[in-house]
């Protein structure tokens, strides 16, 4: 096993094949894709011509389409609703179409974010994750759960799903949402449970839900260096995917977003290859 370095599509001010191309020219190994509009645009990633363009671009620029993030499940809140309701059925449709897109684009990991606020929402999210696991097992796709919940609630979720999901470990979310310590979570999950990492950094003044502003890795208050050392100590090797927002302040104040991306790429590789 070795380390691989990726970037989230939404970290850039552009998307689709252009984002894939820029990731390739920057030197990344792969990319985590968004849904290209998902349900709101009738699932464009399931269109054969669009799939062909994505696959051809990824091959040409030697970019692995590492994962697909179903961000709309969280943004729309549909994952918090029970099945046989319009919202719950919409969540199931997003999951089904996400799995289909993964198969067509040779994507091996589907990322689902869960952050329920009530017991009912928690139960509904668990039901949708169980549904996702059933489909994923048939299609040989890994389900990776990202969550800003406190560690005990995430562990209950993992226990209920009986090892059928892994964790997309975001090293900033526990601080930004005030739900825990990323180092403690990494140590608790260990290498067997973590699918991949979202790498990002920010300022303490931006440690509030809803904030997206970031700073270059290692220049903020999120303890990037200490967290990276913890990742090494547990023996993790795999995908490190930057989720910094390279077009938003305070990082980008009328700067060249590609220069910022290249700086973080250099930081990532020097951190984990030294």
Name the predicted role of every residue range.
Residues 1-6, 67-80:
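N-terminal small/glycine-rich loop or linker at the start of catalytic domains
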Residues 18, 59-61, 75-166:
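Active-site acidic/histidine proton-transfer and metal-coordination neighborhood
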Residues 41-64, 139-141:
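Short acidic, glycine/proline-enriched helix-loop-strand junctions
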Residues 29-41:
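A short beta-strand-loop structural module common to alpha/beta enzyme folds
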Residues 1-5, 13-29, 106, 151-274:
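Histidine-acidic metal/acid-base catalytic patches
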Residues 38-48, 72-92, 116-124, 208-216, ...:
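Surface-exposed, active-site-proximal loop segments in enzymatic domains
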Residues 46-52, 88, 92-95, 122-130, ...:
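Charged helix-capping and loop-helix junction motifs
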């Amino acid at each position: 096993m070795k380390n691989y370095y990726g970037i989230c599509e939404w970290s850039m001010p552009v998307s689709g094949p252009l984002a894939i191309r820029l990731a390739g020219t920057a030197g990344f190994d792969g990319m985590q894709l968004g849904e290209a509009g998902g349900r709101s645009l009738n699932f464009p990633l399931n269109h054969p011509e669009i799939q062909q363009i994505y696959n051809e671009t990824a091959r040409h620029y030697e970019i692995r389409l590492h994962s697909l993030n179903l961000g709309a499940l969280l943004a729309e809140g549909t994952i918090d609703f029970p099945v046989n309701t319009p919202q719950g059925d919409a969540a199931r449709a997003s999951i089904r179409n996400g799995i289909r897109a993964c198969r067509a684009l040779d994507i091996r990991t589907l990322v689902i974010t869960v952050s329920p606020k009530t017991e009912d929402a928690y139960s509904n999210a668990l039901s949708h994750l169980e549904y996702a696991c059933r489909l994923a097992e048939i299609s040989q796709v890994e389900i990776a759960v990202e969550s800003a919940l406190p560690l005990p609630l995430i562990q209950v979720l993992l226990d209920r799903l009986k090892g059928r999901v892994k964790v997309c470990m975001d090293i900033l979310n526990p601080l930004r949402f005030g739900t825990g310590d990323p180092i403690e979570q990494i140590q608790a999950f260990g290498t067997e449970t973590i699918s991949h990492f979202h790498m990002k950094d920010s300022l303490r003044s931006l440690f509030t839900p809803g904030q997206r502003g970031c700073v270059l890795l290692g220049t903020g208050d999120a303890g990037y260096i200490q967290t990276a050392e913890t990742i090494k100590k547990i023996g993790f090797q795999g995908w490190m995917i930057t989720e910094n927002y390279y077009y938003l302040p305070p990082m980008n104040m009328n700067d060249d977003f590609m220069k910022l991306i290249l700086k973080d790429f250099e930081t990532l590789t020097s951190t984990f290859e030294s």
